[in-house]
Amino acid sequence: MSAAVKQIAFIINPISGSRKTQQVKRQVPQLVSQLLDHEQWSPALVQTEYAGHATVLARQYAAEGYDAVVAVGGDGTVSEVAQGLLNTSTAMGIIPMGSGNGFALHLGIPTDAGKAILLLNRCKTISVDYGMANDKLFISTCGTGFDAEVAERFAGNTQRGLFAYVRTVLHLVFAYRPQTYRLVAESLYGEQQPFDISRRAFLITFANANQWGNNARIAPHANLQDGKMDVMILSRHALLDALPLAWRLFTGTIDRSLLVRTLRARQLTLHRQTAAAFHIDGNPVAMPADVTIRIMPHGFNVLVDNNTQAK
């Protein structure tokens, strides 16, 4: 093998995404064979067999000195692979095959499998941040409130994709009751502007990346390389405000709404009245009433298009 050829592993989650996505996923080995530059990359392909397996596999490939590990799946698979590559020189590539693909969309990675593979032939490596909510890692967003309640309901839904998600939202919107939250950020020896605020909010999102997925950009100006999170506080609002807010969400202008307040922090503590629903990258998790959220700067490397600017 030529010394110039780099080792790359594709970790495939066979069950993420819609039925259509799963059909495309079965074509990935053939697409890799046809489209990957084999003078540049020497590929290995493996499927996950259980929850958390992608982390184990990614860590193993990093220990073996692989140059890159590609997550083939949704945001959950991407998060698992990232966790296995923290603080290593092995870079993560992504072939987005989930229902939301928020992290990949933030990075400008195509959702078409063939185009995502071709990107690997003309890629560069950048270092990005990740977040921690207590002891749980997130790469895109975490949060509490209405979206977390939706995530909890959506997790039990047999149907995936945007339309199934919207249906879940509509079923919950009339019954949801917001609570009051307190957010406290210390100065961290001058590293951030301190604050201590209380708000009755519809939802609060702590954003490392700019979106939940499907280009729903809850934090349009979030930057994966700035060492800080964007804290998006959406106030409770009338039902008539829902459509304008949705329009702003998908046009990247929600931060301009008078119903939204944006804060920025490297670390803060969320105090809730109860241990209500909480999500990590769209997946519901059990959390205590108090949650400390922090951003870990430049924790892992990702492969992006050569023309992608730092963001």
Regions found by a protein language model. Give the residues of each.
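Gly/Ser/Thr-rich active-site loops/lids in small-molecule metabolic enzymes
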Residues: G156-R167, P220-D241
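ATP/NTP phosphate-donor binding region
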Residues: M1-V69, Q309-K311
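Catalytic core of DAGKc-family lipid kinases
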Residues: T48, N87-A91, I95-L203
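Short Gly/Thr/Asp-enriched flexible loops that form oxyanion-binding sites at enzyme active sites
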Residues: G76-T90
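ATP/nucleoside-binding phosphotransfer catalytic cores, i.e., glycine-rich phosphate-binding loops
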Residues: S198, N223, I233-K311
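Glycine-rich phosphate/pyrophosphate-binding beta-alpha loops
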Residues: G143, D147, T205-H221, P284
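N-terminal glycine-rich "phosphate-gripper" loop used for MgATP/nucleotide binding
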Residues: A71-D75
